[in-house]
Structure formats: structure tokens, C-alpha cells
């Protein structure tokens, strides 16, 4: 049975596509299913931001085939773990939770590095290219921690 992991950000074009791509590059698709979504619907069906595609490509990860979609309650049924990028994402995702089991699936992705730190991955949308590289580095470290946890426990 596959472990199903969902990455969530605001529009599903910057942070969560990068996180999805990184985690897919580190975990075997025979044992893990990884996807991403956004809390908003503005970009439904769109490809990731060109800067997200570029920074991922610079690290040998291709996210150009991803398409943005909005997080729905069905995602609670379809995923075992839901990682959000910031407190606003967390609040929006939790607003759709119906059970304690739903709520327990949700966590800030950087809590993988420093538990209960409430650290956030900043949205690089209005930033320069370096902001995307910084986000990539944060997410790469967090995904390394996720991989370690799932493969060693």
C-alpha cells in the first residue's frame, strides 16, 4: 500500500510544486504517491510559475508537467500526510477538516526540521529569482527529513 503525501501552498504554482518535485525525486513511486494543491483556485489547471520550473530544473528536477488544482475535502480521504507551507495555508486546510483524524494529517513542512517551530516557507511569488532558490533549499532540507522519517521508521 502506497503512502500518499500532499504538498499545499496558496496557489499551487510556486512552493508546493517545488516540494512535490523534490519529494518525488527522493522517494520510489512504487511505495509513495506525491501530489500538490493550493488553497485558492486562481491558477487551477495552470503550469507552475516559470521561476519554480527554472529553479527545479537547475537542480535536475522537472516539474513542468504539473498542473495547479485546489485543495478539497476529498484530499483528506485520499492522502495520509498533508504538508502546508505557512500558517495561512494551515488555517485554510484545517477549515475543511471534519474529524480529528483529518486535523492530525496536517502539519507545517518546516516542522519536519524543527518540530513545533511554526516556521514558514515564504511565498516567493513577488520575489526575485533568489527567493525561489531560497525556497528550494528550505524545501529540499525538509523533504530530506521526510524521506529519512519514512524510510527509517
Regions found by a protein language model. Name each.
Residues 1-78, 148-151:
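Conserved active-site segments centered on acidic
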Residues 16, 86-87:
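Helix N-cap/beta->alpha junction signal
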Residues 81, 87, 91-153:
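Phosphate-binding/catalytic loops
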Amino acid at each position: 500500500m502506497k503512502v500518499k503525501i500532499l504538498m499545499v501552498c496558496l496557489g499551487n504554482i510556486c512552493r508546493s510544486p517545488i516540494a512535490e518535485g523534490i519529494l518525488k525525486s527522493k522517494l520510489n513511486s512504487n511505495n509513495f504517491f506525491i501530489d500538490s494543491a493550493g488553497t485558492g483556485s486562481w491558477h487551477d489547471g495552470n503550469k507552475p510559475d516559470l521561476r519554480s520550473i527554472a529553479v527545479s530544473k537547475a537542480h535536475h528536477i522537472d516539474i513542468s508537467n504539473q498542473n495547479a488544482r485546489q485543495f478539497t475535502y476529498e484530499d483528506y480521504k485520499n492522502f495520509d500526510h498533508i504538508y502546508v507551507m505557512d500558517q495561512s495555508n494551515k488555517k485554510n486546510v484545517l477549515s475543511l477538516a471534519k474529524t480529528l483524524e483529518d486535523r492530525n494529517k496536517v502539519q507545517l513542512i518546516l516542522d519536519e526540521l524543527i518540530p513545533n517551530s511554526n516556521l514558514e516557507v515564504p511565498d516567493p511569488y513577488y520575489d526575485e529569482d533568489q527567493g525561489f532558490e531560497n525556497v528550494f533549499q528550505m524545501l529540499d532540507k525538509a523533504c530530506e527529513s521526510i524521506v529519512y522519517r519514512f524510510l527509517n521508521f
